[in-house]
């Protein structure tokens, strides 16, 4: 095992430094060394040490195990180990199991046209890149939910352990049911240093460290030292003990049923940073300090003596004992690696698309809200979607491959029908007064948006399906996690052996226009802008205006692969516009003219466009006001449900053709656009369109407080009166009556303001408004 570890370390150092002379058959020269030295050595030998020991455990007990790398900057180690076990060469045949393959392995690392420095999607066996730190443990737990035979060995960097996301991840054990789930073996990689500072956990006492993790509900097993001979024995013993405890916990839960939350084992692995590397460089201690974090010998061209140190370092691993003359790993070492899918680099759970099964989905049409006349029936859109999700849960109960995630908001977001079918999962103490709480639940709620997202990502990456519901304003907490998942998906599409996984779907509700009761802190629609920055072939944004369109969108997203879907929909009782047939057609098109709300007869004086449920209602109310004041005015109403359909087809695959866009929005008429979010995004999406200069967008202007629902729209000039005024101001034929209409609008807004201050609620004409354009036209 020590020889195998040496082989992994040798290949790791070689990746950082060498581009030629891979087996040191000649004296090392500067020409053998890369001109730019990139990578991270400090964490790598520890990762290699753990990998070989986990290989032994897999071999001994025939385990189904994946390796989740928190300190993903140790990329050379994971590449080295998947190469040694053979997986890497199977997926990348050009990196062959010989001297030429080793040379290719070395040259490609952190090199133009090669591979990245981290444990990215290109690395076999990876489900966690570990570039942005903090997510490994939540990914590991997400991976083992509903995977009873899987163990996720999760290496947590001690620097990473200082992040908020990782700190809350330790509580994931309160949601793990050993009767039905797999197990996570956390391994705290305590090498003492970050880039230039000591780590917090390395500088507290043994007793305090042990008490900390016992308090989290774990049984810590310590493996500490620097002597490889002793450390091999200690690690083997600790892993055997940890596996025995995991097996016993699962045996009892599966034979007797779940009773009490167990204390799961974990390992605290204290070893020197940069272990086995140069002890000193230029008289300064390197091994066991922060100086070994990246490239210990970074100035080979400037300091000739460093080349000799590098050669001595490489030769300390005795590569001639590890590889034969052709460069192949010696057979006795090759036998130490597991075979087939038992290899951690080849485990199908780390390439979840291989295991993905389609969900059994109900016919969403059967949950339709019956609509006769548009704008006269009310419904809670998300509650309607909750009925659909309830039955998704029911139909997939046997497969156990669907969960709902959210930060204590499933009930608040009106998805409560799912609790007719399942509970919230919790394996801690449950009181008689608790509702919908059990160890067998399939709704995962914890008040950490990061933990919800990380669990869901781990669940999706290992071949299952999920759904994330969240307050719109607070989804920003996972902005950066969204970034990383979008980047992961982008790279996976470019890696042929990575199979498509289920899309990550957000339902953002309790949104900005209905957070009047909670105030300014809860009012922010900017996640859409953030999402729109990512690759067009990854992201989708939907703004269904009512319950039937929401049903159609949710069903579509549940069937999609390799996307990030963002759905924004309100939970409050709202007017409904489209029957199910019209809703399906509208969602399929992405946007369209609502003929029943238009009177333009093919030649509008202005276009009133809308995207989002509240903007749609306000836009239609504005149309009624304008048509009542100016009966001969021709208005066209366009509703947008797929926001990216606005973008040019050269920029997004959902973008409608330019000629179709021009027919819909005209090439020269004013377009008054009522939009759910920040107005700038609509201008950005439409800037390549012919008529973009005539788009006048009303949306959120960062005005808000605790007030009434309609006043939120007024504060941001998204209300029906400001929209109506905007139409009148921009139609040339209305120049004469424009001033009088402006006075009318001002009087209505003053009436509104006085009423809400006196009564604390919106005017009856606002609260009770219905779409009655036909009655207006008949006047």
Curated annotation (Swiss-Prot):
InterPro entries (UniProt xref): Phosphoketolase, THDP-binding, Transketo_C/PFOR_II, Xul5P/Fru6P_PKetolase, Xul5P/Fru6P_PKetolase_C, Xul5P/Fru6P_PKetolase_CS, Xul5P/Fru6P_PKetolase_N, Xul5P/Fru6P_PKetolase_ThDP_BS
GO function terms (MF aspect): aldehyde-lyase activity
Protein's UniProt keywords contain Lyase: yes
UniProt enzyme class: lyase
Sorted UniProt keywords: Lyase, Plasmid, Thiamine pyrophosphate
Enzyme Commission number: 4.1.2.-
Top-level taxon in the UniProt lineage: Bacteria
GO biological process entries: carbohydrate metabolic process
Family per record: Belongs to the XFP family.
The protein's name: Probable phosphoketolase 2
């Amino acid at each position: 095992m020590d020889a195998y570890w040496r082989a992994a370390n040798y290949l790791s150092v070689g990746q950082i430094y060498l581009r030629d002379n891979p087996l040191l058959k000649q004296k090392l020269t500067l020409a053998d060394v890369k001109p730019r030295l990139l990578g991270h050595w400090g964490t790598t030998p520890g990762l290699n040490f753990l990998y070989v020991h986990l290989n032994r455990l897999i071999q001994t007990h025939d385990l189904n195990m994946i390796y989740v790398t928190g300190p993903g900057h140790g990329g050379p180690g994971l590449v080295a180990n998947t190469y040694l076990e053979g997986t890497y060469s199977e997926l990348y045949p050009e990196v062959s199991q010989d001297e030429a393959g080793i040379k290719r392995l070395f040259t490609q690392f952190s090199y133009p046209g090669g591979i990245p420095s981290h444990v990215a999607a290109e690395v076999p066996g990876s489900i966690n890149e570990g570039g942005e730190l903090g997510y490994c443990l939540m990914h590991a737990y997400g991976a083992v939910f509903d995977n009873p035979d899987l163990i996720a060995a999760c290496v947590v960097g001690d620097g990473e352990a200082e992040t908020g996301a990782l700190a809350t991840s330790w509580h994931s054990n309160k949601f793990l049911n050993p009767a039905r789930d797999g197990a996570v073996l956390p391994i705290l990689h305590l090498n003492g240093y970050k880039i230039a500072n000591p780590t917090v956990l390395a500088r507290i006492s043994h007793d305090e460290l042990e008490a900390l993790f016992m308090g989290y509900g774990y049984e810590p097993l310590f493996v500490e030292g620097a002597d490889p001979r002793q450390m091999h024995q200690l690690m083997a013993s600790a892993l055997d003990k940890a596996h025995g405890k995991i097996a016993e916990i699962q045996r009892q839960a599966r034979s007797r049923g779940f009773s009490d939350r167990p204390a799961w084992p974990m390992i605290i692995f204290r070893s020197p940073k940069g272990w086995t590397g140069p002890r000193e460089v230029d008289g300064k201690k390197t091994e066991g300090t922060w100086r070994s974090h990246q490239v210990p010998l970074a100035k080979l061209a400037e300091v000739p003596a460093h080349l000799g140190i590098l050669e001595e370092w490489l030769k300390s691993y005795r590569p001639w004992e590890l590889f034969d003359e052709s460069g192949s790993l010696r057979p006795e070492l090759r036998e130490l690696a597991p075979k087939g899918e038992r290899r951690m680099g080849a485990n199908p759970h780390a390439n979840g698309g291989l295991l993905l099964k389609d969900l059994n989905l109900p016919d969403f049409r059967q949950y339709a809200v019956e609509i006769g006349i548009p704008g006269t029936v009310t419904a809670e859109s998300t509650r309607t979607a909750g009925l659909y999700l309830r039955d998704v849960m029911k139909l997939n109960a046997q497969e156990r491959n669907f969960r709902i995630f959210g930060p204590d908001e499933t009930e608040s977001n009106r998805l409560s029908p799912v609790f007719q079918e399942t509970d919230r999962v919790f394996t801690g103490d449950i009181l008689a007064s608790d509702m919908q709480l059990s160890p067998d639940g399939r709704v995962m709620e914890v008040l950490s948006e990061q933990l919800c997202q990380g669990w869901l990502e781990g669940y999706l990456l290992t071949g299952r399906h999920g759904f994330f519901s969240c307050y719109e304003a607070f989804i920003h907490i996972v902005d950066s996690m969204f970034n990383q998942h979008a980047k992961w998906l982008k790279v996976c599409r470019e890696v042929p052996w990575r199979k498509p996984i289920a899309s990550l779907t957000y339902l953002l509700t309790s949104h900005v226009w209905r957070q009047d009761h909670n105030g300014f802190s809860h009012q922010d629609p900017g996640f859409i802008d953030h999402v729109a920055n990512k690759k067009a072939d990854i992201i989708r944004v939907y703004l269904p205006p009512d319950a039937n369109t929401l049903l159609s969108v949710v069903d579509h997203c549940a069937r999609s692969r390799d996307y990030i879907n963002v759905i924004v929909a309100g939970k409050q009782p709202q007017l409904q516009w489209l029957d199910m047939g019209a809703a399906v057609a509208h969602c399929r098109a992405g946007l369209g003219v609502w003929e029943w709300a238009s009177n333009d007869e093919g030649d509008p004086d202005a276009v009133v466009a809308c995207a989002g449920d509240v903007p749609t209602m306000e836009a239609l109310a504005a149309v009624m006001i304008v048509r009542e004041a100016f009966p001969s005015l021709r208005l066209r109403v366009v509703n947008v449900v797929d926001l990216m359909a606005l973008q040019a087809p050269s920029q997004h695959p959902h973008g409608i053709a330019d000629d179709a866009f021009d027919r819909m929005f005209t090439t020269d008429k004013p377009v008054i656009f009522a939009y759910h979010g920040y107005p700038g995004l609509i201008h950005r999406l439409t800037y390549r369109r012919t008529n973009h200069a005539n788009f006048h967008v009303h949306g959120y202007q960062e005005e808000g407080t605790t007030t009434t629902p309609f006043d939120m729209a007024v504060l941001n000039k998204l209300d029906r009166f400001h929209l109506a005024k905007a139409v009148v101001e921009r139609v040339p034929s209305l120049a004469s009556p424009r001033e009088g209409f402006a006075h009318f609008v001002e009087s209505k807004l003053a009436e509104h303001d006085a009423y809400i201050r006196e009564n604390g609620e919106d005017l009856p004409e606002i609260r009770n408004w219905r779409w009655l354009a036909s009655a207006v036209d008949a006047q």
